[in-house]
Amino acid sequence: MNEMININTDSYADLAKAMGISAETITQTKKSGSINRLRIWHSPIMGQEEIKGKKVKVEVIEGGAYRLEVIGDKDSTFYYSTNISIRPFMQRFMLRRYIANTGAKPNEPKGMFHRTVMSDTLNSDLKDNTGRFNCGKPSGYIEDFQALSPDMQDLIRQIKRVRVVFGVVTMDEPVDENGEPTTLGDVPFIWEIDNKDAYKTLGDEFAQFITKSRLPIQHMIHLNGTKANALPNGSSFYTPQAETNFSESFDITADDQKLFGDFVDWIKNFNAYICKEWEEKVGDRQNPVSEDDIKTVDDFIDIE
């Protein structure tokens, strides 16, 4: 069990860094234990309803609902809601690249993620689980993207910035997977946001905390529905609609401080896991086994 962490609300600068908002810039014109997972569910969920004595497929949950996966000891329970409110405790950043397994067989993973450690800024090189940095993206600012090789351009396009938000979520009139009303209290969550529009939307809310010298944990971000964005194939993807009401404020309780410490511990464990993967992959690349070495070992094993 982690020790109690004292949150001193009089020290904005120190806590802003701990909560991951000190590095936000404002422009004119963001292997560990299980945490409940929040996301936007883009596809409608179909169910069955009896109409005039016949079972008919109907849409029980619309696309664009917020989905919370509450992780249990053996399986997960899913909750959906059109409107939610989140009380953000902190945020972190990482880079992530999805690698599809095009030849996946039944029961095999369809792909895997290359991902970096989580940091309070993306303005530094981050170790990743492939033994490299930044999922292969070059260091520093790229002045001339077109001067890069086509392969490097393609790789960079595949790498996404991820804003990772930790906090407590309250779901308004939640329903289960069958669209049936259910009850749910305030639940701790992690939300990994990699869509660029959603990334900016939540970043704008965190930027307000900086301009007002407020801490995220003291306020609630209200996510009132989602915005549908049409795709060329006729389907849609959805992005959050967010607003922070600074007229309401929350005191920080002992339970909040414990949960804050739990989130910090989770991030440390996640980063330790990624760093372990990094060290192992670096070792594999620096100490490759040549064909001659393999033959020597085989010859040695064959000696009687």
Language model region names:
Residues K160-S247:
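Extended serine/threonine-enriched, polar tracts that run as long, contiguous segments within proteins
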